Curated annotation (Swiss-Prot):
Keywords recorded for this protein, A-Z: Acetylation, Heme, Iron, Metal-binding, Oxygen transport, Phosphoprotein, Transport
Record family assignment: Belongs to the globin family.
Coiled coil regions in record: none
Keyword Phosphoprotein: yes
Alphabetized PROSITE patterns for the sequence: GLOBIN
Identification of the protein by name: Hemoglobin subunit alpha
GO molecular function, one term: peroxidase activity
SUPFAM superfamilies tied to this protein: Globin-like (SSF46458)
Length: 141
């Protein structure tokens, strides 16, 4: 559960991500594919090369979902219900992959916004990403 301070940190930090969200989402995906090669199996239909238009497009989808989640911190299950259904029932993504992508996104954000990615913001963003991951795997049960 995100505290009031966590919510403040997440909203303020995501605001600083701003127009770079899609770019950072794509970079996090590329980082995940490089660091955790088995994740590529879910994207076998895509060109996974660096800078690929398909990876950029999916990075934008990731960023848009996170922007939606940031706007609904008090109701992540409601905001992400459709995505949860998609990943659980249609795509059948192994739940561990959400942790991998979360980690890679946090690394990407820390690399690009080091002055803003304070220990407190890191902790809050980690809790936020864990919450998003929990919601996305909730329909697997």
């Amino acid at each position: 559960v995100l505290s009031a301070a966590d919510k403040t940190h997440v909203k303020a930090f995501w605001g600083k991500v701003g127009g770079h969200a899609a770019e950072f989402g794509a970079e996090a995906l590329e980082r995940m594919f490089a660091s955790f090669p088995p994740t590529k199996t879910y994207f076998s239909h895509m060109d996974l090369s660096h800078g690929s238009a398909q990876v950029k497009a999916h990075g934008k989808k990731v960023a848009d979902a996170l922007t939606l989640a940031v706007g609904h911190l008090d109701d992540l299950p409601g905001a992400l219900s459709t995505l949860s259904d998609l990943h659980a029932h249609k795509l059948r993504v192994d739940p561990v992959n959400f942790k991998f992508l979360s980690h890679c996104l946090l690394v990407t954000l820390a690399c690009h916004l080091p002055d803003d990615f304070t220990p407190a913001v890191h902790a809050s963003m980690d809790k936020f990403m864990a919450g998003v991951s929990t919601v996305l795997v909730s329909k697997y049960r």
